[in-house]
């Protein structure tokens, strides 16, 4: 993952300008939501290879601000475990290589890398980088299950990006799963309802970005964009 794109990871056929325009539009919606205290939902649609995942990753990568005090942290959620594994490893390797490079600040002072320099991030270990990467690329069912914990407040994430949102489970399928696998006999929501309710616990603003592939529902019980 170099230069804020994933051409080596996620095949895409869209023009770069289309992706830039789409990303800028979503960024504007996020900024308006922050400024006005709004809750917003965006739907990014397209055929396979259109660049939906790339748009979502670009936003998550720029806006994951865990531990900065900005209260904006973004999370990229996917039900595709191989994709999550590959993205985490690729991002970790890329950031690990970048941290070894001397930054402009250290060059100007004619120093070798300063272990306390935030630009170099020389002080970070590969394990620490991987932990940071895990905070903004997650399996969607882990995020969903967090919402079920007793007394669990709103998530730390103000921006949730759902990859392949058309594959979200219908109420019947998710309710049955929660009853039989999670010990939640009274659960009565679809996966979209559950995730929206979780993000709606924020008292001020929040933005949900749904990446939707039309007609790409694969298994029974997957809701499609209508849900």
Regions found by a protein language model. Name each.
Residues 103-106, 117-120, 153:
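Disulfide-bonded cysteines in secreted/extracellular proteins and peptides
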Residues 110-116:
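Charged, low-complexity interaction regions
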Residues 28-41:
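Phosphate-binding P-loop
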Residues 155-157:
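A short acidic, Gly/Pro-enriched loop at the edge of an enzyme's catalytic core
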Residues 96, 104, 126-130, 136, ...:
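Core RecA-like ATPase module of SF1/SF2 helicases and allied nucleic-acid translocases
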Residues 10-20, 27-30, 45-50, 54-55, ...:
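Conserved helicase motor core of SF1/SF2 NTP-dependent helicases
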Residues 127-150:
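Short glycine-rich substrate-engagement loop in P-loop NTPases that contacts/grips substrate
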């Amino acid at each position: 993952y170099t230069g804020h794109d994933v051409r080596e990871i996620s095949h895409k056929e869209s023009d770069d300008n289309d992706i830039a325009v789409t990303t800028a539009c979503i960024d504007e919606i996020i900024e308006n939501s922050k400024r006005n205290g709004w809750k917003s939902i965006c739907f990014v649609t397209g055929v396979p290879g259109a660049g939906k995942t790339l748009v979502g990753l670009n936003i998550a990568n720029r806006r994951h601000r865990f531990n900065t005090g900005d209260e904006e942290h973004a999370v990229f959620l996917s039900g595709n475990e191989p994709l999550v594994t590959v993205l985490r490893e690729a991002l970790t390797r890329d950031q690990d290589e970048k941290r070894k490079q001397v930054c402009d600040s250290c060059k100007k002072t004619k120093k070798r890398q300063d272990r306390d320099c935030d630009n170099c991030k020389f002080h970070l270990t590969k394990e620490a980088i991987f932990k940071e990467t895990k905070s903004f690329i997650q399996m969607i069912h882990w995020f969903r299950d967090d919402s079920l914990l007793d007394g669990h407040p709103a998530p730390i994430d103000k921006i949730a990006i759902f990859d392949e949102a058309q594959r979200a489970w219908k109420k019947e399928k998710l309710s049955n799963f929660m009853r039989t696998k999670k010990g939640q006999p009274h659960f009565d929501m679809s996966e979209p309802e559950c995730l929206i309710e979780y993000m709606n616990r924020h008292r001020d603003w929040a933005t949900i970005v749904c990446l939707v592939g039309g007609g790409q529902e694969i298994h029974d019980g997957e809701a499609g964009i209508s849900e």
